[in-house]
Amino acid sequence: MVNAITSGDILSAEQIKRHSKVYAGPGAGKTYFLVENVKNIIMTNETVAKSRARKVLCITYTNAAVDEIRRRLEKYVDYVEAYTIHGFIIEHIIKPFQEELINIIKSDFDISVSKKGMISSQIEGLGILHGIDKEEIYNFIKSTNPGQFDSDAFNYSKKIMGEVEVDNDLFLKSKIAGEELIHKIKASSKIKEDHVIPLKQYVWSVVRKLTHNEILYFGYRILENNPTALYALRVKFPFIFVDEFQDTNPLQTLLVKLIGQKSTQIMVVGDIAQSIYSFQGAKPSDLND
């Protein structure tokens, strides 16, 4: 059973034992609801109050919103963590489970990546190949893919290098709903375009960065593939609040639902009439599901 409440409510002791959906329009105090309910859980729920190893997780969709939540909950810093969805995945899934990430890159894309060095996220606002000499890329590709990447392919790839951070459109489309998205990714990952796969090998092996779409994809795949990773998150975060849920794209929704299948209670807060990230494939209707 799922609670369906308004942003004026404080969740009762019984309600926090179930997943909750909070409907609130613009200016209805969604952040206030989130902050006050986090405080209530910290002060009244023994699972969190008596163990600083177990925390309330807040996920929202802008760095400014993260800063605001952290500011309002500053006194409770030992009991709560706040991130954007990408920040959460990097910190709690990608970084701790690097070996699993490398194995999934191999199994899903048939690309071998060395275990030397941390694979993390690109710097916000910069292309993933920002500041890297194209000849360095060419020499790497020639050495690792002899005979598979000729000069014509390289000349073509140079035209798209400025777009490598979004070349996931070739096999990481996020405009497809639910499980269909995962099947689409897995199916099209078998494509071996000479100008894409070697570049991806360079980015993942040498630059060691993931694009925003890749963070979502690999975060989900690690949890799907590694019960230990999933269990660790459920133990650490018995309560998760997701703000602006109407802006959640299908892969983000799948990830949150996966965590919430056992133990962890999910509270989603949103307004189905207002989606500022619809270009990412966000489905406001997920708030009703």
Task: Enumerate the language-model features and the residues they cover.
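Catalytic P-loop NTPase motifs of RecA-like helicase/translocase cores
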Residues: 41, 89, 245-256, 275-277
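Coupling/switch/interface segments within P-loop NTPase motor domains and analogous charged loops
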Residues: 103-204
